[in-house]
A protein has these predicted regions:
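Residues that act as N-cap/strand-start positions at coil-to-secondary-structure junctions
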Residues: 6, 84-86, 111-113
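A broad structural signal for short, well-ordered beta-strand segments within beta-sheet-rich domains
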Residues: 8-11, 63-69, 112
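Long, contiguous binding/interaction regions
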Residues: 2-3, 72, 118
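Hydrophobic beta-strand-centered segment that forms part of the acyl-chain substrate-binding groove
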Residues: 53-92, 98-99
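Compact, glycine-rich, soluble single-domain proteins
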Residues: 39-44, 48-49, 53
């Protein structure tokens, strides 16, 4: 299931060699929030991971899959009602069809999510 342009939207994207910076917004009325949680939307952790994957796919123009993860940390609840714009940072190194990534979702000094892992071209 693709989340881009339905669950989340890219407001600004600044790719440069080995670094992607983006600003996104989450659709607080998306059907995912009917169950997570009604009236109090909280972005599911799996959606945070998928946001990183889809932004990388948009940058490299190829489908990727998370094949290894050293660290996945969900540090703060991310609410689309309270956090209208979310910053995304993906530091990556290409290595033989794989991408070593260090990614985070944050707003100001509040870090919601961190991921260190390996993406493989699908």
């Amino acid at each position: 299931m693709t989340l881009l342009n339905d669950f989340f939207f890219i407001l600004l994207q600044e790719p440069s060699p080995n670094l992607v910076k983006a600003k996104i917004t989450i659709n607080e009325h998306h059907k995912i929030f009917e169950g997570h949680f009604p009236g109090i939307p909280v972005v599911p952790g799996v959606c945070m991971v998928q946001i990183i994957l889809e932004i990388m796919e948009a940058v490299i123009r190829k489908p990727v899959r998370l094949t290894e993860s050293d660290t996945i940390k969900f540090l703060t609840v991310m609410s689309p009602k309270e956090n209208k714009e979310i910053d995304v940072s993906i530091d990556y190194t290409a290595e033989r069809g794989r991408f070593l990534i260090n990614a985070s979702l944050f707003s100001g000094s509040v870090i919601f999510f961190k991921l260190n892992g390996v993406l493989t071209i699908d």
